[in-house]
Amino acid sequence: MELGMGTDITGSDYTKAACRAVFNALRQNSLALAPAFGKSRDDMHCEIVIGVQRPDAVRTDEVAAILPYGTREVRLEKGGLDTPREGPDGEPTGFTILANAAILVRLDLTQDDLDRLEQAK
């Protein structure tokens, strides 16, 4: 599992915040699971879970396109945080969006794959 957080401070764009959360998760971690098991990175199954206050406002195709390899599925949940912003006069000017992302990575392994790993020890 890889975790990240992203924001859109001034644009109130949920997709931008979600994409930044996925980029953040990728920068802090490594999707090195597949090569460690002698598989291709394209064999990985990646589920991206995004938490934002308005899940319906996230364009999932843009979020999925961030991952460089593997099959991708995006699941949206209500979460994250919207923080109101005020201008110099104290009037509301919009809000800052905080999105959370979790990337769940799975790899299908056969018994032969596991046996090969055991022999390599």
Indicate where each model-derived feature is located.
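Conserved mixed alpha/beta catalytic, RNA-binding, or beta-rich assembly cores of soluble enzyme
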Residues: 1-38, 51-59, 100-121
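Short, charge-patterned binding micro-sites
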Residues: 40-44
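C-terminal edge-of-domain segments
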Residues: 72-121
